[in-house]
């Protein structure tokens, strides 16, 4: 038994350039970057026997800008109704609440909601299979990664202001949640309780995006008796920064046995991998290891491309 349903979401809105950890020069380039990431993620999951579905607010725009990817991906257009302040950083990531609502109302026995800049590089570990069998709710704890860069006290203060009570700081990454529909439904309901408070407290003062309100919601669920396990030690998911970082990150060889790896700064590397059309299960890990060193040249090239608006890469 494997979690047969993996979901990602892509909210599109012109003039709200919500690209994260990547240089893009236009709305069109943003769409194509994230769609190519979704495509290589989908291929890697399919190579290991999993299905991937992309949730979006504008399937017509996806079809217009990337018709081939639109045909290949399983895409569902859903309602995105979360009120998001215009101009806020990470604008589109706020709509994760709508993806939580959607999965809370689905009939899947078990599903995972993941970021698009990820790869499936191994067979699902037994711990994930057991989590599905038992209906275990999962998240990914990145406290040891985020505290060195953001500081423990600002993170704790933000959550305590949102929730109105003291908390034991455990910070989850936005790239991975898995569980039965009841878990996603409970998360959505918890976010709805504190969302406006999150906006009032955070905009202009603290971190913004889906991570802060997701963490507040998980804290509410724990307070209400939910048992939510960390998928990181299970080997289910890991975040690898392909650049110097403030936390103690091991070399990439320590990530080779993970099921899913999140690659926040490697969006252009993932796009390059897609052009090479890997298909065998083992080829995704091999190809990433061979091309990961290109992240900086690709980032610089795409930044120049975005500024000039006329640069074209010729094969």
Regions found by a protein language model. Give the residues of each.
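N-terminal anchoring/stem segment of glycosyltransferases
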Residues: 1-84, 107, 289-315
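Hydrophobic anchor at the start of a short beta-strand
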Residues: 51-53, 111, 225-228
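Active-site donor-binding segments of glycosyltransferases and PAPS-dependent sulfotransferases
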Residues: 58-96, 247-251, 255, 265-283
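Short beta-strand-to-loop acidic/aromatic patch adjacent to the donor-nucleotide binding site
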Residues: 100, 108-119
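Conserved donor-nucleotide/metal-binding helix-loop-beta segment in metal-dependent transferases, i.e.
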Residues: 120-157
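Short, flexible, basic/aromatic active-site loop/helix in glycosyltransferases
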Residues: 154-168
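Catalytic core and acceptor-binding pocket of nucleotide-sugar-dependent glycosyltransferases
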Residues: 166-260
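Long, low-complexity C-terminal extensions of enzymes
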Residues: 244-315
